[in-house]
Amino acid sequence: MTAPAAPVYAFDQALVVRAGSQPGERYAEFDDQWRIGNGVHGGLLLALGAAALRIELDGAGRHPDPVAFSAVFPTASVPGHVVLQSEVLRAGASLSQAQVRLLQPAADGSVDERMRAVALFGDLGKRAEPVLKTAAAPTIPGPDQCVGSDGAIDFLAHSTLLDRMDIRLTPETAGWAAGKPSGAGVLHGWVRFADGREPDVLSVLWALDAMPPVAFDLGLYGWTPTLEFSAHLRAHPAPGWLQVELTTQTVVGGLMEEDARIWDSTGRLVGQSRQLCGWRVPAPR
């Protein structure tokens, strides 16, 4: 009797890399299925960069997990061919360090750098205990009592990324979608993959950038590009929904910070991040 074929998930397909022509070089492809606006979703860049570094750092099976990941994004990514250039900075006993550049060919024959990241890798399975202090998950309505993305505002409604994920916002923090932002600068909700793929460490890294911009809750609609991103991965997530919280405290001079925290279905904190975002200051009338 033939065993049933293993399911093929969109996220895993998007993270497929193949060997390049130089040491530390890998190739990948961005299709049109992870687009937000006209560009490829930044969370996918983070996960792809981590996937390439995992190959470089986990040769001995010691350091399979990103523990910290920091990136800048010089230019916006687009669907098409991707070159990843990885360099190991230090291979340690318990933690290793590396950097990765994500490049794409430009129309004029030059090469555009899309992301440059440095990362710390280790084994989160060996760092699950002891838990001396941690942040508890906020009490929010369950996914079935939250608001889906069916009524996404116009420029998000044309983003193929929404087809790849199931995202639910609490009614209290979804008012911006109806033109009624709370002004608090807070979003609470749930996220999972639309095709049923269960979360892992790379998908937590992706999910840290998967929610709508917290700027929307301030009534700042439009594009808020990520300028710098830093994440800490704290544990392997349990199966099920990921609970996400986004907050901001400072929006000044066209720059804002966005802090994210993610808990798994058991209530364990599995990821946290801070990113510096830009927003366009309205021109004076």
Predicted regions, residues:
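Terminal targeting signals and extreme-terminal segments of soluble enzymes
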Residues: 1-285
